[in-house]
Amino acid sequence: MKRTFQPSNTSRKRTHGFLVRMATKNGRLVIKRRRAKGRKNLAVRIATK
């Protein structure tokens, strides 16, 4: 049986990215909560070299 986590930066950004969060009301609430908590990263950010 193959493992469930098959990492891909594309699908990661498409489902958990900042623009996707901002697109819906509930997504904006997620960002709001993370701002209030003082998170350094509000949404998934793919590291670049």
UniProtKB/Swiss-Prot annotation:
Gene Ontology biological process terms from the UniProt entry: translation
Keyword tags: Ribonucleoprotein, Ribosomal protein
Domain of life: Bacteria
GO CC list: ribonucleoprotein complex; ribosome
Molecular-function GO term, any one: structural constituent of ribosome
Family: Belongs to the bacterial ribosomal protein bL34 family.
Record's protein name: Large ribosomal subunit protein bL34
Gene assigned in the entry: rpmH
